[in-house]
From Swiss-Prot:
The gene is moaC. InterPro entries: MoaC, MoaC_bact/euk, MoaC_sf, MoCo_biosynth_MoaA/MoaC, Mopterin_CF_biosynth-C_dom. Pathway: Cofactor biosynthesis; molybdopterin biosynthesis. The lineage of its organism: Bacteria, Pseudomonadati, Thermodesulfobacteriota, Desulfovibrionia, Desulfovibrionales. Homohexamer; trimer of dimers. The active site is at 129. This is Cyclic pyranopterin monophosphate synthase. Gene3D superfamilies: Molybdopterin cofactor biosynthesis C (MoaC) domain. GO terms for molecular function: cyclic pyranopterin monophosphate synthase activity. Its EC number is 4.6.1.17. It catalyses: (8S)-3',8-cyclo-7,8-dihydroguanosine 5'-triphosphate = cyclic pyranopterin phosphate + diphosphate. It comes from Solidesulfovibrio magneticus (strain ATCC 700980 / DSM 13731 / RS-1) (Desulfovibrio magneticus). Pfam families: MoaC. Belongs to the MoaC family. It is an enzyme of class 4 (lyase).
Length: 170
């Protein structure tokens, strides 16, 4: 039953993978998602005029905090010593979309993809929370890993990585 699944034991029960024998390497991951708003809500967000305050600064802090707590939220994730975590936003007022991008890095035995994804998603959920008083039909979508480097599997670049954009320094 567990054949091919690293997080299942021989009986099919969940288990945490033993990474103790792996070599520590520098690992970096970039993840993204989108928050779709109405034009009216976007105008409030862009001018920091939402009733709850400045959504983007709050979301940035929430995303960074979430990256540091990923192992507490995702049951089989290893706690990692993060070297860096950041959250950035591309506010597209014309499309009424906030593109959230999160980056995390470490020197460890396992990757930081989940930390980057968690940071992006929690930042997006924080934007949702900050905007829900003025809009009920907000959509959070397109959560994905854009880039990862380090470790045995090497570098992954999503087809959605922007053309011409340099890869992060690993």
């Amino acid at each position: 039953m567990s054949e091919g699944f690293t997080h299942l034991d021989a009986d099919g029960a969940a288990r945490m993978v033993d990474v103790g024998g792996k070599t520590k390497t520098r690992r970096l991951a970039v993840a993204a998602c989108e928050v779709h708003l109405s034009p009216a809500t976007m105008a409030l967000l862009a001018t920091a005029a939402l009733p709850k305050g400045d959504a983007l600064n709050t979301a940035k802090i929430a995303g960074i905090m979430a990256a540091k707590r990923t192992a507490d939220l995702i049951p089989l994730c290893h706690p990692l010593p993060l070297a860096h975590a950041d959250v950035r936003f591309d506010v597209d007022q014309a499309a009424a979309v906030v593109r959230v991008e999160a980056e995390a890095s470490t020197v460890a035995e396992t990757g930081v993809e989940m930390e980057a994804l968690t940071a992006a998603m929690v930042a997006a959920l924080t934007i949702y929370d900050m905007c829900k008083a003025v809009q009920k039909d907000i959509v959070v979508s397109q959560a994905k890993l854009l880039f990862k480097s380090g470790g045995k599997s090497g570098t992954f670049v999503s087809p959605d990585w922007p053309a011409g954009r340099p890869y992060p320094a690993s």
